[in-house]
Amino acid sequence: MNSLAIIGGGSWGTALAIILAPRFPRVRLWVYEADLAERMRETRENDVYLPGCRLPRHVEVVNQLPAALDGAEIVLSAIPSHLVRGLYQQMLPFLNQSMVFVSATKGLENGTLLRMSEVIRDVLRNRLAPRVAVISGPTFALEVARFEPTALVVASTDATLAEILQGAFSGPTFRLYANSDPIGVEIGGSVKNVVAIGAGVVHGLGLGHNAMAALITRGLAEITRLAVAMGGAAQTLAGLAGLGDLVLTCCGDLSRNRMVGVELAHGRKLEEIVSSMKMVAEGVKTTNAVSDLARRHSVELPIAEQMLQMLQFGISPREAIQRLMDRSLKGESG
């Protein structure tokens, strides 16, 4: 495979263009904002979302979808979850059966509760029989763009496709593991953002390392329960797309979702926090969908439920933590 189209000019899309450019002779990066696209062409830098990281010379920055998709063999989307359906609908006239579609978005669609790979299939199914994969794992865009060692997962129900993409994407500092469980991978990448808000609360309230360890461990138990109920494999959540991503997002200072929790613990209002952010904290948007999925599959997710109560119904961060501590006692597997 020689031609790659990356849809999304945020920090993650830009980082993917930088890290994957050595692997593909032709790379096009679609950027929504025309003025930003023009500056990126001139300066070879995304000064809004990933300043200080230079785009390789042969990465072509475009602002029009037809130009981005023309001749592409792989379409890799790295856009906020709430934009995926609409953008794929816009792209539909320019797509063809030979293309492979890869989602790098971590989130769920509110209302339908679909995972991102399911949204892509839903849009394309009447016209194409799409080959779809997902990439996910513990990845901060800045570290990827700096060529710091990173490992993640590429998952598809088509094991051969996952292995092809593993070979196409892997490089000296970007190691991919093939996986045949997109359900587990996508649920891990989505629900960890909700748990990370709780981790931010723990940090922001100064509750200590014991509390953080408990939050991460019980959060992983919740993610695993939901993924298994939906048909995913428990072992997936013990890997990069589960435990790995959860630890990074809960503990790393670059985590936007963790930052939301920290700021809430410091007394700021959610609306103020979100409006001040350049990039989306997916956990804020995902919390409702996770709660709805839990009810649909009769799975108990107490941490996710308290994050919903805090984000949507206004209970205080300290009360959310205390409610978790006051729950009825049970076995660890419960």
Feature locations, PLM:
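NAD(P)+-binding Rossmann beta1-loop-alpha1 motif at the extreme N-terminus of oxidoreductases
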Residues: M1-C53, H58-N63, Q90
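Conserved active-site and cofactor/substrate-binding residues in soluble primary-metabolism enzymes
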Residues: I7, S11, A15, D35, ...
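Rossmann-like NAD(P)(H) cofactor-binding subdomain of soluble oxidoreductases
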Residues: L55-D70, I74-F147, L165
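N-terminal loops that bind phosphate or other acidic moieties
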Residues: L76, V144-R146, G198, A211, ...
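Internal alpha-helical scaffold of NAD(P)-dependent oxidoreductase catalytic cores
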Residues: L83, F94, V119, V123-R131, ...
